[in-house]
C-alpha cells in the first residue's frame, strides 16, 4: 500500500509540473490536468486531477477501463461504488469497477457547501 501511495504521489507531482505550462481545453467540470502514460503491453495509465465546489453529482457516464481509483487529496466527495452512498475525505479513496455506469443519481445525498480535490487514476487498453 505504501508503494502504491508513493507512486500516486510521484504521479501527482509529475502531472502538476507537466500541466503547469500546458493550456488545454477542459473536457470535464473541474478538470485541472489530464495525462496519459504509456505502460507498454498495449496498456496506458490515465491520471486526472479535478477540483470542484458544490458539484453535487456528475452526468451519467462510465469508464472503459480495467478500473478506476479515485483518491481524495483534499475536501469531501462521495461515491456509490460500494452499492450505497459513502462520504470520503482527505486521504481516503474508492475503486470503481470496469464499465460501471454512474452519475446523475437522484438519490445522491446533498453534501452542502463543500469542495473536493481529487486524483483519478485508471488503467485501460491503449487507444
Question: Model-found features: residue ranges?
Answer:
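Ligand-binding loop in jelly-roll beta-barrel domains
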Residues: 78, 99-127
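Short acidic-glycine-tyrosine-enriched beta hairpin
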Residues: 40-42, 52-53, 81-101
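Extracytoplasmic
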Residues: 42, 47, 67, 116-118
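Surface-exposed patches in mature extracellular/periplasmic domains of secreted proteins
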Residues: 59-62, 83, 105-107
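A short beta-loop-beta micro-motif enriched in histidine and acidic residues
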Residues: 55-68
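Glycine- and acidic-residue-biased ligand/ion/polar-headgroup-sensing regions
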Residues: 65-83, 92
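A short, N-terminal "cap"/entry segment at the start of jelly-roll beta-barrel domains
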Residues: 3-6, 15-46, 87, 94-95, ...
Amino acid at each position: 500500500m505504501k508503494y502504491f501511495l508513493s507512486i500516486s504521489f510521484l504521479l501527482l507531482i509529475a502531472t502538476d509540473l507537466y500541466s503547469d505550462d500546458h493550456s488545454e481545453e477542459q473536457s470535464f467540470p473541474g478538470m485541472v490536468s489530464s495525462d496519459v502514460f504509456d505502460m507498454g503491453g498495449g496498456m496506458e495509465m490515465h491520471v486526472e486531477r479535478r477540483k470542484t465546489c458544490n458539484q453535487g453529482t456528475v452526468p451519467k457516464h462510465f469508464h472503459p477501463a480495467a478500473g478506476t481509483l479515485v483518491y481524495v487529496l483534499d475536501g469531501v466527495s462521495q461515491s456509490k461504488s460500494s452499492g450505497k452512498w459513502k462520504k470520503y475525505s482527505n486521504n481516503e479513496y474508492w475503486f470503481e469497477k470496469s464499465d460501471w455506469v454512474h452519475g446523475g443519481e437522484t438519490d445522491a445525498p446533498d453534501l452542502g457547501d463543500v469542495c473536493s480535490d481529487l486524483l483519478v487514476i485508471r488503467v485501460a487498453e491503449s487507444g
